[in-house]
UniProtKB/Swiss-Prot annotation:
<dbReference type="InterPro" id="IPR050857">
    <property type="entry name" value="D-2-hydroxyacid_DH"/>
</dbReference>
<dbReference type="InterPro" id="IPR006140">
    <property type="entry name" value="D-isomer_DH_NAD-bd"/>
</dbReference>
<dbReference type="InterPro" id="IPR006139">
    <property type="entry name" value="D-isomer_2_OHA_DH_cat_dom"/>
</dbReference>
<feature type="active site" description="Proton donor">
    <location>
        <position position="283"/>
    </location>
</feature>
<protein>
    <recommendedName>
        <fullName>Putative 2-hydroxyacid dehydrogenase SE_1879</fullName>
        <ecNumber>1.1.1.-</ecNumber>
    </recommendedName>
</protein>
<feature type="binding site">
    <location>
        <begin position="155"/>
        <end position="156"/>
    </location>
    <ligand>
        <name>NAD(+)</name>
    </ligand>
</feature>
<feature type="active site">
    <location>
        <position position="265"/>
    </location>
</feature>
<comment type="similarity">
    <text>Belongs to the D-isomer specific 2-hydroxyacid dehydrogenase family.</text>
</comment>
<keyword id="KW-0560">Oxidoreductase</keyword>
<dbReference type="GO" id="GO:0051287">
    <property type="term" value="F:NAD binding"/>
</dbReference>
<dbReference type="Pfam" id="PF00389">
    <property type="entry name" value="2-Hacid_dh"/>
</dbReference>
<dbReference type="InterPro" id="IPR036291">
    <property type="entry name" value="NAD(P)-bd_dom_sf"/>
</dbReference>
<feature type="binding site">
    <location>
        <begin position="283"/>
        <end position="286"/>
    </location>
    <ligand>
        <name>NAD(+)</name>
    </ligand>
</feature>
<dbReference type="Pfam" id="PF02826">
    <property type="entry name" value="2-Hacid_dh_C"/>
</dbReference>
<feature type="binding site">
    <location>
        <begin position="234"/>
        <end position="236"/>
    </location>
    <ligand>
        <name>NAD(+)</name>
    </ligand>
</feature>
<keyword id="KW-0520">NAD</keyword>
<feature type="active site">
    <location>
        <position position="236"/>
    </location>
</feature>
Length: 317
């Protein structure tokens, strides 16, 4: 019987779809799957459903005798050696679109949380308490009417821009290509990175990672930002040099930061945890019931298509 190996628990809606068609084995151990377990799991599998946290390198691919598809449960796919998979005639798919609204919502949530000191205020209210309303007490920054600078105006970046416009924000964006139709639809302005850094009150990273973007935001870039600026990263951790971010916060080069992704994920740079003006969330960009269920359906449906001889919908290689 055709076999599918799943590298970790996924929502039942996708799991049940796969079980209707194939023999399914799923890793259900504690923590992330280790390399040897994954190699054993894929040895006789026709399909691998990998998680964004699953490293699928050449060694893993070479361990699989029958593999036809790697269906990645995530919009990104930098955890997979995509080119080598193609050389072995293995399709790699992802789950685009499903993450868009959830991640855009979180991006705006991070902006509001750090600018209005919501997390800090929650902690104060639960611990020492406060003496009541006062004119100079616990002031933050307004979001409405400010300028947002979006690095990466893809689907998620575009959704962030639409939400920002509802706050009457001016929208700047940068990326490898100008997107004139989106500019007109959203009311965004294309600028180079330096111009964005110098003018934005909130700089949001919503780009997918590739090696050319490694440490795109480093000491030089922080020094170009406003002293009242906030950095928001809901894209990929390695785009930001976290040590440079720590130094920028220490030296009050910028006013604060909010991160959902990390350079050394799942590890978080310890120094970041000490700043009250930093909000940290555990990579929950698309962690909604709706998004995660949709992602499960996509990986299941693309796996079913491939193993039934049809072309998957979301091939990335």
């Amino acid at each position: 019987m055709t076999k599918v190996y799943i590298a970790g628990a996924i929502p039942e809606v996708g799991l049940n779809l796969l079980k209707e068609h194939f023999e399914v084995d799923m890793y259900d151990g504690e923590g992330l799957i280790d390399k040897e377990t994954l190699k054993k799991g894929v040895e006789h599998a026709d399909a691998l459903v990998s998680l964004l946290s699953t490293s699928v390198d050449k060694d893993i691919i070479d361990s699989a005798n029958n593999l036809k598809i790697i269906a990645n449960y995530g919009a990104g796919f930098n955890n997979i050696d995509v080119e080598y998979a193609r050389q072995q005639n293995i399709d790699v798919t992802n789950t685009p679109h499903a993450s868009t609204n959830a991640t855009a919502d979180l991006t705006i949530g991070l902006i509001l949380s750090v600018a209005r000191r919501i997390v800090e205020g929650d902690h104060l209210s639960r611990t020492t308490g406060f003496d009541g309303w006062a004119p100079l007490f616990f002031r933050g920054r307004e979001v409405s009417g400010k300028t947002i600078g979006i690095i990466g105006l893809g689907e998620i970046g575009g959704a962030v821009a639409k939400r920002a416009r509802a706050f009457d924000m001016d929208v700047l964006y940068t990326g490898p290509h100008r997107k004139e139709e989106k500019e007109r639809d959203i009311g965004a302005k294309y600028v180079d990175l330096d111009t964005l850094l110098k003018n934005a009150d909130f700089i949001t990273i919503n780009a997918a990672y590739n090696p050319s973007l490694h440490h795109m935001i480093d000491t030089e870039q922080f020094n170009k930002m406003k002293s009242t600026a906030y950095l928001i990263n809901a894209g990929r951790g390695p785009i930001v040099n976290e040590q440079s971010l720590v130094e920028a916060l220490d030296n009050k080069v910028i006013e604060g930061a909010a991160l959902d992704v990390y350079e050394f994920e799942p590890e978080i740079t310890d120094a970041l945890k000490s700043f009250k003006n930093v909000v940290l969330t555990p990579h929950i960009g698309n962690a909604t019931f709706e998004a995660r269920d949709m992602m499960a359906k996509i990986v299941a449906n693309d796996t079913i298509k491939k193993l039934n001889g049809d072309e998957p919908q979301f091939i990335v290689n």
